[in-house]
Amino acid sequence: LDRRQRQMCIRDRPIIYVNQVGGQDELVFDGGSFAIDAQGELSVSAQTFIEAFPIVTVDRSSDARLAPGDTVAEREDLDAVWQALVLGMRDYVDKNGFPGGVLGLSGGIDSAVTLAVAADALGHERVEAVMMPFRYTASMSVEDAKAEAQALGVRFSNLSIETLYEAFMTTLADEFSGLPANITVSYTHL
């Protein structure tokens, strides 16, 4: 707000800044509409990341001065980022008609944060977390993933991918027979 306010007050005129709020595909519009008077003083402001309908009163009898109205405090940076993520996810899911979301949960911090955003955006009843452990997955990761889902009240499934891996390796066995098993085989053999 401060940067926009500074830019606008150099014009020596009252300014009403109106911004939409909501997510549209990969974009998130923060809302936060406001009005400043000719001296650069904030007259009216709306909260960011929620729909708001602030009232701006223009006194036409006195050189279009703005009457003081309701103002809100700006969000802290971390709160603004959180609200942007929540709003973007909620609008993306809802506007595309999805019933909810399913996400892979590893037990790590990145998927835990994603799960928390999803639960906040959609409600715990519209989110399902799936842990897909493999032979190298630590039991602590499985336990952490389950605890994260339980803490947020999200449905949790533990589906091992071991049998999928074995089926995949069996399917490729003839193509790669006689070659050493390593990560570069797929590139050198092609």
What is each PLM-predicted segment?
Residues 80-102:
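Phosphate/ATP-binding catalytic cores across multiple sugar-kinase/actin-like superfamilies
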Residues 67-76, 98-103, 130, 178-183:
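Glycine- and acidic
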Residues 13, 98, 154:
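Short glycine/serine/threonine/alanine-rich loop segments
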Residues 14-86:
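C-terminal beta-strand edge segments of enzyme domains
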Residues 1-6, 10, 189:
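Single conserved hydrophobic/aromatic residue that forms the stacking wall/gate
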Residues 17, 28, 34-35, 42-43, ...:
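Structured core elements
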Residues 50-57, 126-131, 135-182:
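A conserved beta-strand->alpha-helix junction
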Residues 99-105, 109-146:
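ATP-dependent adenylation/pyrophosphate-handling site
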